[in-house]
UniProtKB/Swiss-Prot annotation:
PANTHER family: ANTITERMINATION NUSB DOMAIN-CONTAINING PROTEIN (PTHR11078:SF3), N UTILIZATION SUBSTANCE PROTEIN B-RELATED (PTHR11078). Belongs to the NusB family. GO terms for biological process: DNA-templated transcription termination; transcription antitermination. It comes from Clostridium perfringens (strain SM101 / Type A). The keyword Transcription regulation applies. The gene is nusB. The lineage of its organism: Bacteria, Bacillati, Bacillota, Clostridia, Eubacteriales. Involved in transcription antitermination. Required for transcription of ribosomal RNA (rRNA) genes. Binds specifically to the boxA antiterminator sequence of the ribosomal RNA (rrn) operons. It comes from the Bacteria. Gene3D superfamilies: NusB-like. This is Transcription antitermination protein NusB. GO terms for cellular component: cytosol. Keywords: RNA-binding, Transcription, Transcription antitermination, Transcription regulation. InterPro entries: NusB-like_sf, NusB_fam, NusB_RsmB_TIM44. The keyword Transcription applies.
Amino acid sequence: MNRVKSREYLLQLAYQMEITSETALETFNSFMENEDISKDDLDLAYIKSGLLGIEENKEKLDSLIESQLVKWKLNRISKVNLSILRISTYEILFAEDVPGKVSINEAIELCKKYSDNKSVSFINGVLDKVYKNIK
């Protein structure tokens, strides 16, 4: 199973949930029905639990993220960056099989690929504060 690729799909689906009114389960089921996407090497349990966990803990995740923002409000963060922050914050809080520092590094890699260069240091700074507050 490819966790990096699975995390990329989790990002895409978390973003989809953010811009639509779909629930996590609807989003995941729609993804599973898409025959154009090869799912052979994906960690589907990771993707599904991530979506459900983000949905279930959205208020807690957003509150924790917002508490680490300096001169920013949550609604000013791009939906892609917010999705990245939610995934990593969820992993830091709840994913026992993903070390916090690994989650932050993976979030930075997602940011490099799906956002802009200015966002990399922003994402890193917020997640570093989240991690230090939790540990």
